Design a protein with these regions (language model features):
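Flexible beta-alpha connector loops of hexameric P-loop NTPases
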Residues: 13-15, 45-47, 210, 241-251, ...
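Switch I (G2) and immediately adjacent beta-strands of P-loop GTPase domains
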Residues: 44-51, 55, 218-246
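Conserved C-terminal guanine-recognition region of P-loop GTPase G domains, centered on the G4
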Residues: 23-27, 59-60, 76-86, 256-328
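N-terminal accessory targeting/assembly segments
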Residues: 1-101, 403-404, 408
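Short alpha-helix plus adjacent loop in nuclease-associated cores
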Residues: 98-116
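C-terminal-of-GTPase-core extension/linker across diverse P-loop GTPases
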Residues: 2-8, 125-197, 203, 293-408
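Switch I (effector-binding) loop of TRAFAC-class P-loop GTPase G-domains
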Residues: 181-187, 205-233, 249-257
Length: 408
């Protein structure tokens, strides 16, 4: 296997800038061999994004280390990319392009592939005219000989492709609505959180399944829905694409239906990697809540602080005390070692806003329905009738009691 050597560069506005070189490294390592990371604190330079002196310094490092690709943690304009590639004499991409390449690698289903293509085209659209302008100057490979008419044709071609993909995704969304309608009789729990927080491992722990969980970012792009085991109620849990800082609006839009599948549930499990540095946990919690707010998530939340097996009591107290304002119904668990998983299941039940109803009936169809669709708490046989106490969603309890009242 040929290793492609990468150099990582990040420009920060100031020391308080929350952009993370560690996160960029974690992303890059999915596809490349990282040879070095470099940070510069300064205001953005219109020509290079970073300062010209820093560019010269990095050019020498690229040559000396035989670097194949330079990856920026900042969004680059086509002109900046061209200027940097001219100086480094290797390919230059930014963080968004890197994420799109990772998405492309992991997109296995038709929907995921369409979502990735949509994100790629929406990334390309505002850059199209500038890329063609460079081509007209003979400075952009693959775009030679473009006139004004061709520029507009290229731009309109991208817009048509975007429209076509959106139509295809809309049809898939309608199919998803049908599936969701079928599942409405079940309680639903969504797994959300920063990429690589351990959502898939938690899914396995709660469902008793063994979906492959890699220690790598963005391995889950499609939704996976399973039934939680060890609970009498039929509760479905859905895992989907992880969140990330600096995700542009077009990327959230491309994966909106997938994100909504997890976010619009009766209950949300917001999964956090508790083993990380306290500042990193805070940064990711802020991102999580920002994205949930963007998609107008109104669901009840349990904050699941995963990987508790890697931290001590002091760290647990530090998290609870310093990050209290971000923690909604917190619980420490280890999905890997099943620590506090049963306690989490109880919390799930307690936070589903369920109601309890009691009916007296001798109707076998109703009895069968209750056993299939609700959680039976008690069933007492008396005078050839069943006095059944059951638990379900409040609207379902009210509906069952109303129907039973009409029948009697």
């Amino acid at each position: 296997m040929i290793l492609i050597k990468a150099l990582l560069v990040l420009r920060k506005d100031n020391k308080k800038d929350r952009k993370s070189i560690e996160e960029l490294k974690e992303l890059a390592e999915v596809l490349y061999e990282v040879e070095g990371t470099y940070i510069q604190i300064r205001k953005p330079d219109s020509k290079y994004q970073i300062g010209e002196g820093f560019v010269k310094k990095l050019s020498k490092i690229v040559k000396d280390k035989n670097i194949d690709i330079v990856i920026f943690g900042n969004t680059l304009t086509p002109t900046q990319k061209y200027n940097l590639a001219k100086e480094f004499k290797v390919e230059v991409i930014d963080k968004i392009e890197l994420v799109l390449r990772i998405f492309s690698k992991h997109a296995k289903t038709k929907e995921a592939q369409l979502q990735v293509k949509l994100a790629e085209l929406q990334y390309e659209l505002p850059r199209a005219k500038e890329k063609v302008r460079l081509a007209k100057q003979g400075e952009q490979p693959g775009f030679g000989g473009y006139g004004d008419y061709e520029v507009e044709k290229y731009y309109q071609k991208i817009k048509r492709e975007i429209k076509s993909i959106k139509n295809k995704l809309e049809k898939l969304k309608e199919h998803r609505k049908i599936l969701r309608k079928r599942r409405e009789k079940y309680d639903s729990v969504g797994l959300v959180g920063y990429t690589n927080a351990g959502k898939t491992s938690l899914l396995n722990a709660l469902t008793g399944e063994n979906k492959e969980a890699k220690n790598q970012v963005f391995t889950t792009l499609t939704t996976t829905t399973r039934r939680i085991r060890g609970i009498k109620r039929k509760i479905l849990i859905t895992d989907t694409v992880g969140f990330m800082d600096d995700l542009p609006p077009f990327m959230i839009e491309a994966f909106l239906s997938t994100i909504e599948e997890s976010a619009n549930n009766d209950l949300i499990l917001l999964v956090v990697d508790a083993s990380e540095d306290i500042k990193e946990i805070e940064r990711k919690l802020i991102v999580n809540h920002e994205i949930l707010e963007k998609i107008n998530c109104k669901s009840q939340i349990i904050t699941v602080l995963n990987k508790v097996d890697k931290i001590d009591e002091k760290k647990k107290l530090e998290i609870l005390n310093e990050l209290d304002r971000y923690l909604i119904n917190p619980i420490f668990v280890s999905a890997k070692y099943n620590i506090n998983i049963e306690k989490l299941k109880k919390m799930i039940l307690d936070n589903l806003n369920l109601s309890i109803g009691t009916i007296e009936t001798d109707n076998p169809k109703l009895i069968s329905y209750l056993y299939e669709n609700t959680e039976i708490l008690e069933d007492i046989e008396e005078n050839d009738k069943h006095i059944i106490t059951f638990r379900a969603k409040e609207k379902d309890v009210n509906r069952i009691l109303k129907i039973h009242k009409i029948e009697t």
